[in-house]
Amino acid sequence: MDNFFLGLSCQEENNFWDLIVADISGDRSVSVPIRSAFRSYMKDTELRMMSPKISSSKVNVKKRMVNLLRKNWEEKKNTVAPEKERSRRHMLKERTRREKQKQSYLALHSLLPFATKNDKNSIVEKAVDEIAKLQRLKKELVRRIKVIEEKSAKDGHDEMSETKVRVNLKEPLSGLDSMLEALHYLKSMGTKLKTVHANFSPQEFSATMTIETQIRGEEVEKRVERRLQETEWKLLFLPEASFYKDY
């Protein structure tokens, strides 16, 4: 809208200067007789020769004055236009910033309790309270987890029981890889290996192991057999993924 009015203003100014120049050029000029009690002595020929020069000189001076005024006016106009454009851009940026800030406050308000007021001060104060409350809860949870882990480690050390685990795998791709993977998995479960008796053949892989563990023997067997099936799948589709080179 500002650009529209600025364009109309420029057009009106140009028309104004054109009218002034047209008046000066003699299209619609009004001559004013010079009244004086004295009259200079000149011949008729000299008067006819000098009158066009005098008239032309007056017109040139007036044109120069008009051009000078127009130049000064355009310079002022050119300095005012960028300032208006800068103010307009600043206003748009400020409006965008306030809109983003409003959306941020609304998003934060949606995460707070239902009874929270929707003014900025209430939102910020309630958010600070909620953050402090969450930090206290976090510290309490960390403390409880630490206590449970310490108790679990102590109870586990006292309740370790010895049991036998038997695993069986039909037509293994690599009995050695299967055995190594079973031992590695038992170690990751926190068990202690006592004895191992294994049988390798192209038709079957079987192993009987005596271990100390907190978990029931049946559960250990299921987990180890499931892990061996995953190992067979890896060896079948990824032949280069042999576990033998990792030990």
From Swiss-Prot:
It is found in: Nucleus. One of its GO terms (biological process) is regulation of DNA-templated transcription. One of its GO terms (cellular component) is nucleus. Residues 85-134 form the bHLH domain. The keyword Protein transport does not apply. Keywords: DNA-binding, Nucleus, Transcription, Transcription regulation. PROSITE patterns: BHLH. It holds the Pfam family HLH. GO terms for molecular function: DNA-binding transcription factor activity; protein dimerization activity; transcription cis-regulatory region binding. Homodimer. PANTHER family: TRANSCRIPTION FACTOR BHLH041-RELATED-RELATED, TRANSCRIPTION FACTOR BHLH92. This is Transcription factor bHLH92.
